[in-house]
Amino acid sequence: MAGACRNPAVALAEEDKEAEAMTLHQNLIAGEWVGEDGVANVNPSNTNDVVGDYARASAEDAKAAIAAAKAAFPTWSRSGILERHAILKKTADEILARKDELGRLLSREEGKTLAEGIGETVRAGQIFEFFAGETLRLAGEVVPSVRPGIGVEITREPVGVVGIITPWNFPIAIPAWKVAPALCYGNTVVFKPAELVPGCSWAIVDILHRAGLPKGVLNLVMGKGSVVGQAMLDSPDVQAITFTGSTATGKRVAVASVEHNRKYQLEMGGKNPFVVLDDADLSVAVEAAVNSAFFSTGQRCTASSRIIVTEGIHDRFVAAMGERIKGLVVDDALKAGTHIGPVVDQSQLNQDTDYIAIGKKEGAKLAFGGELVSRDTPGFYLQPALFTEATNDMRISREEIFGPVAAVIRVRDYDEALAVANDTPFGLSSGIATTSLKHATHFKRNAE
């Protein structure tokens, strides 16, 4: 009979998870938690695991949040810097103190490995800590005028109501690096996190709320971009918008913002090149390529999905990459020893496998990986895929896939490698593996 008894600690942990999943996590509008209808947030490593139930805001909720932020702005924009410092510092301290818990939440809702989840959470805490310090370093300038009797004083003023729209792939770091500076400099915020991963964003807002933010300064509206995001774009009371996400949506944000003459900031897609020259240290080049292309399941806008390799090292590099890929463990994000977690959801998995099929049809060779993987729990598992014999005009070389799929493009020399690297409509990030200071410096200055 003793063998049938449950470990009390395990039983308590399971009960806590069940209670958390059943709790409705509401939107925060004008300092009040509101919302009745929720949507389940599901773990991509185990689709039987419901992370939590999160309210879905309507367009009317978004309008109420904007109105609350507008009403709170005059007082918050003139608040004392020590008040802002204390709130942001308290938030940073709690995030860092809860890094294991919040990192685990991140891994459960987005699918990054636990080490990546905790690392991103620490980064979020550090961001809040940095901007807590920045509140005490606000500066201006007094400069002489060419006109007698005239003084020139330059001050930095808050913009007003800032709309924040964040993506699903960095569910705690990107909200941190948008929310923290907005609050630091006296702006009020209407925040719409990605629909797929509301948990970490809700946790940050809850921490800030308890840290003492006045009502209406920070408003959380979880829901569909087509509903909540559109209401933010349509409102003349939103003075600035910061957006990270797809290029197509970013263009719509830009057009809507121009119509309202508002400030806007966009962080969008990439098709990033990683160049490997003949003189590269092979082990360093392979490790850099694997990390950049496949870690975080390749779900980073800075992932290097175009690997451009010169002829002299090409075959050795591909063989070494293949061996490294074979050693990658694809499994539950929370399991010890997992290198690559699941893709975030079924839709993204379908996109990844569609592009693998496109690559084959275009004539590229699927050299390693690319298979769906079954594990102990139902999840969206995909073995990292490496194509060879790709060309830069193929769709797999030109379109952002946003998954663990990379293509090797063979080139003659450095000059061709640079030309291929720059032959893209994107311009986000790039890298090079070489022992030549000349080529490294030239690439740094000329990669577009």
Predicted regions and their residues:
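Terminal low-complexity tails and localization/encapsulation signals of metabolic enzymes
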Residues: 3-53, 86-90, 140-165, 265-268, ...
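Short, well-ordered beta-strand elements within core beta-sheets of diverse protein domains
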Residues: 39, 51-57, 72-78, 164, ...
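Residues at or immediately preceding the N-termini of alpha-helices
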Residues: 44-45, 59-62, 81, 99, ...
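Residue-level signal for inorganic ion chemistry
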Residues: 48, 84, 106, 128, ...
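Glycine-rich loop-to-alpha-helix module at the N-terminal edge of alpha/beta enzyme cores
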Residues: 49-138, 149
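Hydrophobic face of alpha-helices
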Residues: 66, 85-92, 103, 121, ...
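Rossmann-like NAD(P) dinucleotide-binding subdomain of oxidoreductase/dehydrogenase enzymes
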Residues: 140-284, 411, 434
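ALDH superfamily catalytic-core signature
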Residues: 234, 240, 248-391, 414, ...
